[in-house]
Curated annotation (Swiss-Prot):
To E.coli YgfZ (UP14) and B.aphidicola (subsp. Acyrthosiphon pisum) BU435. NCBIfam families: ygfZ_signature (TIGR03317). Pfam families: GCV_T, YgfZ_barrel. This is Uncharacterized protein HI_0466. It comes from the Bacteria.
Length: 280
């Protein structure tokens, strides 16, 4: 049975105007020009040092109309940074109070949203200006865990402006980073990380059976012979039905046999294979 989930943690932003495509092309890590109309991708907006202040799901309607989905907890600062130079272009950024629905499984044929964003073979996001006749039967945590399992990263206030896009594996996801388009904010750092091997970090998935929660921005522990030392940064953490799912940014050269655990816990974390390759 399909699950319909109200994605209340997200804010929808409509970007429109004669310069919308050109403006976003100079701001985001994706190639906005080459993104097909009706297509969606994760993308990031960086500061001048190449550190991400926001991760967006970008949806292109046309060269003059786009939608961005972003977590509400990073919205104020993230959006302010994105539209900082918009005053010089014919582009507007408007918050839309639309219904945002995550669907896992088949969509009902009777539901006809304004827009449908295909995330993968099993998941989609429906955007509608008014309320759709949907029976919500899934918790938002289910969607968050699905993101973790798919290796789709999350940025929170605790991790804003801390990581370059490759540290959260964006080079391996959808059309999140273009290394061939022109300049954008932070582009030099992102390119250097690829072509000079400057990036030494990657995001990994872990799970453990426990009732514990984990704090985003905190560390885990790694075993070194008879001792344990702190390592990594937790960027996503969701406990669903007694299973704690984590995304952790760590050094990208960790051994597959390395042992990890939560802070102040004797229970070992189980490393889950990423659904994509992070080899650049």
């Amino acid at each position: 049975m399909s699950q319909f989930i109200s994605l209340t943690q997200y804010q929808l932003i409509e970007v429109q105007g004669a310069d919308a495509e050109k403006y976003l092309q100079g701001q985001l890590t994706s190639d906005v020009v080459r993104l097909a109309s009706g297509a969606t991708t994760l993308t990031a907006h960086c500061d001048p040092k190449g550190k991400m202040n926001a991760i967006y799901r970008l949806f292109k309607v046309s060269s003059e109309q786009f939608f961005l989905l972003v977590k509400k907890d990073i919205l104020p600062s993230g959006l302010d940074a994105l539209k900082k130079y918009a005053v010089f272009s014919k582009v507007s950024f408007d918050l839309r109070d639309w219904q945002i629905i995550g669907v896992i499984g088949e969509k009902c044929g009777k539901i006809t949203p304004n827009f449908s964003l295909e995330i993968d073979e099993k998941r989609s996001i429906l955007l509608n200006e008014t309320e759709l006749p949907v029976n919500f039967n899934g918790d938002e945590k289910i969607w968050e865990v699905a993101d973790i399992q798919a290796g789709l990263p999350n940025l929170s206030p605790q991790t804003q402006n801390e990581f370059i896009p490759q540290a959260l594996n964006l080079q391996a996801i959808e059309q999140a980073i273009s290394f061939t388009k022109g300049c954008y904010i932070g582009q030099e750092t992102v390119a250097r990380a690829k072509y000079r091997g400057a990036n030494k970090r990657a995001m990994f998935i872990f799970k453990v059976q426990t009732q514990q929660e984990a704090e985003i921005g905190s560390e885990i522990e790694m075993q070194l012979e008879a001792n344990w030392r702190k390592t990594g940064t937790i960027t996503s953490a969701v406990n669903l039905d007694g299973v704690l799912w984590l995304q952790v940014v760590m050094n990208n050269d960790i051994d597959s046999e390395q042992q990890f655990r939560l802070l102040n816990s004797e229970i070992l974390l189980e490393r889950v294979q990423l659904p994509y390759s992070i080899t650049e």
